[in-house]
Regions:
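The conserved cystathionine-beta-synthase
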Residues: 423-442, 448-449, 467, 487-506, ...
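Adenosine-phosphate binding glycine-rich loop
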Residues: 266-409
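Glycine-rich phosphate/diphosphate-binding loop of Rossmann-like nucleotide-binding domains
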Residues: 108-237
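Rossmann-like adenosine-cofactor binding region
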Residues: 183-186, 191-305
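A short, polar/charged loop-to-alpha-helix boundary motif
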Residues: 462-478, 525-539
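Bateman (tandem CBS) regulatory domains
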Residues: 412-422, 428, 473-485
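Glycine/serine-rich phosphate-binding loop and adjoining beta1-alpha1 elements at the start
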Residues: 7-8, 24-148
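Short hydrophobic beta-strand motif reused across regulatory alpha/beta modules
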Residues: 455-461, 507, 518-526
Length: 539
């Protein structure tokens, strides 16, 4: 699995669970071969440099025991430098989103997620006319790129870069409104994006500073410029596209009880929302709020909604390249360097050119993958929505992700998911087999001969049957075992395995190569991995 480390004073296990579920859908939507993961650190704001270093070192050691199932990256409260600390402690391949000197890419500085949002907008301009087959969109008019107006809520790594990419990639398009924590700016003819981006890079929040600078340089300020100290009032303005890019999941609702940024009946006129911010939650109550909002905004008002993990996966796509394009063996620092920052730095300096070339290779692959998959997501969303007038955008998005998970999992082979199976010598007794089954979570035992080859299997049912007919405890095991074994081979697909289990009405079977026992697959294992319910519909 892959997902970031969130470090906040109030982060909770429940929040981490919800975020991990969201990452599952995001990684699937990004067409990446990883499940969703997340981890959390409870820490106060304002840690000193040394305190932060010690926290990250300690957490790296805690995470290492899970290095074969979880790849950490940055999230709220952590950054690329923290990932470098983890890599120093645990090895280059045990963290993603590392700095360029380790072969990574500066994801926030490159605007990886923001780029995906603007790619989604570009694709929507082409695909949205198909929505006219739905009654709420029958009068939809899609502007040309040079006539496009956009509002952006939030001026962080996503919002600021989205504004810059919009003006660069879609010449003539205008960012007419932009908000941050201090307020919002609006001008119907477009804001000075380059100026605002430079302010953001230099000092962070832009709206108030730009407004105050404008008061002192009135002759250089466009007439009609509006500033409000209430950030949420940006949502009252009208534009073709609204991009939520602030760390607020609940930006709209029909009921003030959920504490949204704005009520639906108070927003301006929009035609599409592209969610740069993370808004998904598996929490049942939050999902009810979300569907309620979409019924009002999408179905009644005719505003298309491009769900967050369909469009903002650029960051995880960029990070994943550090695993998809492996670090060559000769660039991995020796194990004895782990934990020795000075030795690792010397190693990186000695191989700086090769790491730089590796970073460029990964960047090119990431940009290509991001552009292709996000355009595909938009096309698939529109396909689903126009085929079912009752479907909501969040339902379409979830269906796309789950469909990809199912496709990926169905391609897996038995050898990739099997678990160990206990074995017992054929010379054993029924009593010993019964004890072995009681002491093992496995529903079956593999019975092996003197050459350690499969001779049969014993199940709870075999033991129960032997007991019911009064068989003595010392009865040889070979007299009650099942000799005609239903088994899987390593190359069986998951669908093949499920078909065998269901056809023969068994709950488990060994995986064998020739007569050698490799492991076991059971219906319980498939259910634990959430495969069964995803794949049964395809049988």
């Amino acid at each position: 699995s892959m997902g970031g480390i969130r470090m906040l004073p109030n982060v909770t296990p429940a929040a981490i669970h919800n975020l991990a579920r969201g990452m599952t859908l995001k990684n699937a939507a990004a067409n990446l071969p990883y499940g969703g993961g997340k981890s959390g650190i409870v820490a106060e704001y304002g840690l000193s440099t040394q305190e932060r270093l010690q926290v990250m070192k300690g957490f790296a050691h805690l995470l290492y025991r899970y290095h074969d199932v979880y790849l950490p990256g940055p999230d709220v409260g952590t950054n690329d430098a923290d990932m470098k600390t983890i890599a120093v402690e645990s090895g280059l391949d045990n963290a993603v989103s590392k700095p360029v000197d380790m072969g990574g890419n500066q994801i926030d500085q490159l605007g990886a997620a923001a780029g995906g949002v603007i790619i989604a907008l570009d694709e929507l301009l082409k695909e949205m006319p198909r929505l006219r087959s739905l009654s709420q969109f029958e009068n939809l008019e899609v502007p040309r790129a040079e006539e496009l107006t956009v509002l952006i809520q939030g001026c962080g790594a996503v919002g600021a870069h989205a504004a810059r990419f919009l003006c660069s990639w879609l010449p003539g398009a205008r960012v007419t409104g932009l908000s941050d924590e201090n307020g919002y700016l609006y001008h119907q003819d477009g804001l000075p994006v380059d100026t605002l981006f430079n302010i953001w890079q230099e000092s962070g929040p832009v709206t108030r500073q730009y407004f105050l600078n404008s008061l002192m340089e009135e002759e250089n300020t466009p007439s009609g410029m509006k500033f409000s100290s209430e950030p949420d009032d940006l949502l009252r303005e009208s534009a073709f596209c609204f991009i939520p890019a602030a760390p607020v999941a609940n930006y709209l609702d029909t009921d003030s009880g959920s504490d949204p940024c704005m009520l639906v009946d108070q927003i301006g006129r929009w035609h599409v929302i592209i969610e740069g911010a993370n808004t998904y939650s598996p929490d049942p109550e939050r999902k009810v709020f979300r569907s309620r909002m979409e019924r009002a905004v999408y179905r009644q008002m005719g505003v298309m909604i491009a769900s967050d993990y369909m469009v903002n996966s650029g960051g995880v796509i960029f990070a994943a390249q550090e695993q998809l394009i492996k670090t060559p063996g000769h660039l991995r620092f020796p194990d004895e360097y782990k934990g020795n920052a000075r030795a690792v730095e010397d190693w990186l300096e000695d191989h700086a050119q090769e790491f730089s070339e590796l970073a460029e290779q990964r960047l090119a692959a990431a940009e290509s993958h991001r552009d292709e998959v996000i355009r595909c997501n938009i096309r698939e969303m529109i396909d689903l929505l126009v085929s079912d007038a009752d479907m909501l955008p969040n339902e379409a998005a979830e269906q796309i992700s789950i469909r990809r998970i199912a496709a990926r999992e169905s391609d897996k082979k038995a050898v990739e998911i099997m678990e160990s199976i206990p074995t017992i010598p054929i010379a054993s007794t029924v009593k010993l087999a019964a004890a072995a089954l009681i002491n093992s979570p496995s529903p079956i035992l593999a019975v092996v001969d003197d050459d350690d080859q499969l001779a049969g299997v014993v199940t709870d049912w075999d033991i129960t049957r032997a007991t019911s007919i009064g068989s003595p405890d010392n009865l040889p095991l070979e007299q009650v075992m099942t000799r005609e074994v239903i088994s899987a081979v390593p190359t069986d697909s998951i669908l093949d395995v499920i078909r065998k289990l269901e056809h023969h009405e068994i709950s488990a079977m060994p995986v064998v190569s020739g007569k050698s026992v490799l492991g076991m697959i059971s219906s319980d294992l498939l259910a634990r991995q959430s495969l069964l319910r995803l794949l049964q519909s395809q049988i």
